[in-house]
Design a protein with these regions (language model features):
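Glycine-rich beta-strand-centered segment in the early N-terminal region that forms part
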Residues: 27-42, 54-115
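A eukaryote-biased signal for short, well-structured alpha-helical docking elements
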Residues: 1-9
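A conserved mid-domain beta-alpha-beta active-site/ligand-binding segment of alpha/beta enzyme cores
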Residues: 10, 74, 119
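Short glycine/threonine/proline-enriched tight-turn/helix- or strand-capping micro-motif at secondary-structure
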Residues: 13-25
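Short, Lys/Arg- and Gly-enriched loop/turn segments at beta-strand edges
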Residues: 47-48, 115-121
Length: 121
């Protein structure tokens, strides 16, 4: 817990994930990580509104903009509002340090952590 995901930070070095410009969002996980298959993301209102208005409320453009943000930053954090959202998903893989805990692959999860600090692929 002491690193708090800092090994995923690529820009700028030495920052925590939620403050970083870019995260490593590769699919391989470390011993203390888990990979969650996204089922839904609830964007914060400012984030959602800014993306929608900049895309003229066109669904295909909104989807493309979200994909562009995650490809560029490795996480879903709007570069204009600095806001993000929370996610719902299913555990796909668990790192070895989590073995024996109260969750397993296939469990549903809702993050209490903003997607600003989570790698999104």
């Amino acid at each position: 817990m002491k690193d708090f995901g800092s090994e995923r930070v690529t820009e700028p070095p030495g920052t925590i994930p939620s403050m970083a410009w870019k995260l490593d969002n590769s699919r391989e996980i470390g011993d203390k990580e888990m990979r969650v298959g996204l089922r839904a993301i609830k964007l914060e209102w400012d984030n959602f509104n800014q993306i929608c208005s900049s895309c003229h409320y066109t669904e295909s453009k909104i989807k493309a903009r979200i994909e562009e943000i995650t490809a560029k930053r490795g996480k879903l954090q709007n570069p204009y509002t600095q806001s993000s959202g929370v996610l719902y998903g299913v555990v796909d893989e668990v790192g070895t340090l989590w073995e024996g805990e109260d969750f397993k692959e296939g469990d549903s999860v809702i993050s209490l952590t903003s997607t600003a600090g989570l790698p999104v692929h």
